[in-house]
Amino acid sequence: MQGRLSAWLVKHGLIHRSLGFDYQGIETLQIKPEDWHSIAVIFYVYGYNYLRSQCAYDVAPGGLLASVYHLTRIEDDVDQPEELCIKVFASRRNPRIPSVFWVWKSVDFQERESYDMLGISYDNHPRLKRILMPESWIGWPLRKDYIAPNFYEIQDAH
C-alpha cells in the first residue's frame, strides 16, 4: 500500500521504496544513501520542518546497518501533525550516509551517537567524532558482531 507522500514522490520521479505503515499509521520509506540528502532537502521544503529523532541499528550480524529518521510536519491550526519515518540502509563494510545536519540542525548529536555506537560515517557532518565512548575506543559497541574487550583492570579496582 502506498501513502500520499509516497505517491507524490513517484509522481515527481524520486526513487524510494515504501515499507508500509506502522501501528499509528505513519508511513515508512526506504531511501538509498546516494539519494538521501537531496530527498531530505525536498522533504524540508515540502514542510517537514522538524526532525523528531534519528537513531540507528544493526539489521543482522554481518548484514546492513540502518539509520532511521522520524520527521514531523508542523503547521499552524493543525491538531495532528503529519509524520514520516525514513530508513536509509548502508553496507557494513563501508557504512556511509550523507549527513542531514545542514537541513535539520537537531540531528547533530544523534548522528554522532550513531557513528560512535555503530560506525556509520555521516558525510559532511561538521563534528563527526565519538560522543559517548573515549576517542581511543576500538570498535562499534552496538554492532551485533562486536566482541567486548576484557575489563580485568576495572574489576580488579574494586
Curated annotation (Swiss-Prot):
Protein encoded by which gene: ndhJ
Residue ranges the record marks as coiled coil: none
Superkingdom in the source lineage: Eukaryota
Gene Ontology BP term (one): photosynthesis, light reaction
MF (Gene Ontology): NADH dehydrogenase (ubiquinone) activity; quinone binding
CC per GO annotation: chloroplast thylakoid membrane
Keywords: Chloroplast, Membrane, NAD, NADP, Plastid, Plastoquinone, Quinone, Thylakoid, Translocase, Transport
Enzyme class: translocase
Organism: Solanum tuberosum (Potato)
Family per record: Belongs to the complex I 30 kDa subunit family.
Name of protein: NAD(P)H-quinone oxidoreductase subunit J, chloroplastic
EC number of this enzyme: 7.1.1.-
Chemical reaction(s) catalysed: a plastoquinone + NADH + (n+1) H(+)(in) = a plastoquinol + NAD(+) + n H(+)(out); a plastoquinone + NADPH + (n+1) H(+)(in) = a plastoquinol + NADP(+) + n H(+)(out)
